[in-house]
Amino acid sequence: ILLTAILVGAMLLLLFLITGNSALGDLDERAEEALEYCKENGYSTDYCLLVDYGWHSGRVRFFIWDFNKGKPVMKCLCAHSYGQGSTARKPVFSNEIGSFCSSLGHYRVGREKTMSKPKGRKALVLYGKDKTNSNALKRGILIRPVSLPNFPIYPLLIPVKVHKVFGHKIRPKSEGCITIPFRKYSRVVETVKSSSKPLMLWVYE
């Protein structure tokens, strides 16, 4: 039994390393595309935000990308929404009001606001710039902090309902919002507020 457990653990580690390397390569390519978009549309060419919903939800898939350094300077878990049959493994995307789905596309990151629910909590306003997310402002789509671990939980998945993982109570509560851990949110706000130009967020799969 012990030998079997060791072999399974080794296989999972190998799988993680292999998929991790391929994912980082894809991230580099996405960052190059993002830089061109930022140049053409007047966004910051120092930083952008990237979310890859094509990745396993137990892995980091939210990134602050530093164009000057050519690498992410912050990365963390990011929950997707639960609407229209979305599961922990596979999100469903929609731009419809009332769909409670995540939306793909480019966003302009706006000001930080104080939410009424949960009362007093801060969040960053998002403006959808594509046909796939044009209703973002009407839907109240935000970047906001929630109870998520500060570390990857792969091969476990982030559930779309309240659940516990490694003793951490996970409450994604996303109805389309980009939800990240509390401790990582402050770094995002700091990056947004220190920029002389608006930041672009790109959500893709």
Residues covered by each model-derived region:
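Hydrophobic alpha-helical membrane-insertion segments, chiefly the h-region
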Residues: A10-I18
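Cell wall/extracellular polymer interaction/catalysis modules
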Residues: G20-G176, F182-E205
